[in-house]
């Protein structure tokens, strides 16, 4: 399991969330025990005014900040892969989130990639889309891929996620999700898209992704169908 037992990070403050308010348990807190409730002490009655008639505590209900789309984290690890009969059968859906608050609560309680076992994969896909070639929405698509040194992997993964959930791509409707592959031979992040034949959309996504991350090397787009039939011999359809 990739969820670690640590409190929610102070990054929540950057999203205009006050950690000193009392909130009811969120769905995340109910399903992921490692995530702590974001709450503080209720305001004590003033000592100067002894109003015994009213001792009601005040609860501030936070307003959620919704994303345009809901997203789901998926995970796959080497031990599961070694025993699987059908590719992708070991994929596990972790949690679906739809708000800024849920995203940071989940992200801040997932082990960083550098603590994973080599061969692990973490996915963040739009809800209702499974990170498999066989998924109807992914079937005719492909992926852009970037390679990173381990020292910058986590920051580039986070920036990719923020670009996705924050709808920073002009062709965002064309994107299925992102994948982080933790490998001994080279860590990589990929963006999966829906329609490989839509050259204009694919080139736009590839160029914007490079600009957002400040990535200087050439990246290539490989069609899923080519990858299925040719494996590592699959050629790049587009490059930017």
Curated annotation (Swiss-Prot):
UniProt keyword annotation of RNA-binding present: yes
One Pfam family linked to the record: IF4E
Native species: Arabidopsis thaliana (Mouse-ear cress)
GO cellular component: cytoplasm; nucleus
Tree of life domain: Eukaryota
Subunit comment: EIF4F is a multi-subunit complex, the composition of which varies with external and internal environmental conditions. It is composed of at least EIF4A, EIF4E and EIF4G. EIF4E is also known to interact with other partners. In higher plants two isoforms of EIF4F have been identified, named isoform EIF4F and isoform EIF(iso)4F. Isoform EIF4F has subunits p220 and p26, whereas isoform EIF(iso)4F has subunits p82 and p28.
Keyword tags: Cytoplasm, Disulfide bond, Initiation factor, Nucleus, Protein biosynthesis, RNA-binding, Translation regulation
Keyword Nucleus: yes
A molecular-function term among this protein's GO annotations: RNA binding
Residues annotated as binding mRNA: 83-88, 115, 133-134, 183-188, 228-232
Composition bias, Polar residues: 17-26
Entry protein name: Eukaryotic translation initiation factor 4E-2
